[in-house]
């Protein structure tokens, strides 16, 4: 519940550190000035916001929803995955993020290095190559 969450943020004086933004057409300015991106989706296809965060070398903590995050984060090698809907697991990941600087840096590096597989030109060439096999 958004109201309860906003109340919790106010009561605990977290307004300077926690922002609940909701959907943004262009998330780039928000991600650029953040240290970590948390995706709490129950369902995703290809969560572009994760790719955008990784492009900006931001750390990602994501729900392990049915498709998308696990693949992008390479089963957790490129970020942290928490059990979908488990805010206890999410809070553990956030605490781990704050304490494990070397681990976080290595996961950011891994995620950024893995972006090549999402390169548009490379994928278009692959599609073209596979489609022309049928001619």
Predicted regions and their residues:
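A short, well-ordered alpha-helix in the C-terminal region of glycosyltransferases
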Residues: 89, 96, 103-117, 129
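Conserved acidic donor-binding segment of nucleotide-sugar-dependent glycosyltransferases
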Residues: 74-87, 96-101
